[in-house]
Amino acid sequence: NPVLDARGGPNHVGNFCGAPIMIDLDTKQVYYTPIFHILSQFSRTIRPGDAVLTTAVNSSQLPPDALHAVASINADGLISVQILNTGPAPITLGVTLDKHNAVITMPANALKTIQFNLAL
């Protein structure tokens, strides 16, 4: 469910769930959770019809599961690389695509998108 109340309902099994948007029915406050912002970023840079590209993350110097990446390309040749740092510390990394290179620093617990335009 994209929207749930502060207790994670309503749902059909009576357990507690999270959602992109949570609403406190008592105070009428709306909370946009981190997953809302992640989905928002993905939906702006990965569109229907885009193709997923093979990505490789060389993270042998990092804790397991600290760094994740996925890339896509659209019909205009724009490549979007989504990078997620799940660790508690910033990570400086290089991103290479053919002749394009970028060195970026990922803040702790952050998602970042970098884009390359192959048409340029």
What does each model-found stretch correspond to?
Residues 1-120:
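Substrate-binding and catalytic surfaces of secreted/luminal carbohydrate-active proteins
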